[in-house]
Amino acid sequence: MKKIKQKFSWEKAKDVATADFLAEEVFERDSYEHVYPVQEGDVVLDLGASLGPFTWKIMDKASKVYTVEPMIDLIPTIEKNTEGFPVTIINAALSHNNGEIEFNDNCVNDFKPKMVRTIDFKTLLKENNIDKIDFIKTDCEGGEYALINDVNLPWIKENVRNIVGEWHVGEKLQQIEFKYFRDKFLPQFKNFEIYSIDNHSIKWDLYNDHFLEHYTQILIYIEV
């Protein structure tokens, strides 16, 4: 197993607070591997990589990492952080459709919106010759629904082991989307756990609308 020698670079982070939040989430709380860890030799898909902290954390264990990030300004930092490891960087945003969209990332030190490429999941698989994924991490501001849906679910159930994602539920529309996803798709998996951002189990709270309204972001861990 190749050891990571380069220090993680926070170049292009919006500010110190943003860097601190990402560092705490990925490195200190171990949020994305809290329930299901990445295993030696896994093929990993990192959706919404930002500066690449999760990719950097697991790239010495994975046999291959596909790192997806829509903001072109962040790509050089991701390249620097992952140099020498089996990481393919894809400059795009996961979406229901292929095309372009105006996009702004609040983790970047430039608030000007930019046009970014959008790519659907099946195109992502085809363009990168992906035939299986052991572990998917997703934090892509609603792109989770472009991943887990009726079109993609059959492939996912045959070819993916675990999915870990951050869902946003702070707004009314987000809560409606989440409840539909919760009731239709989550029961189709072998197991799932739901945690608050600070790593407290809230699986059954999320079936109570009163409790749901108290959360803005949640983490879902899925055993496919």
For the regions a language model picked out, list residue spans one by one.
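Phosphate/nucleotide-binding beta-alpha loop and adjacent structural elements of enzyme active sites
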Residues: 1-224
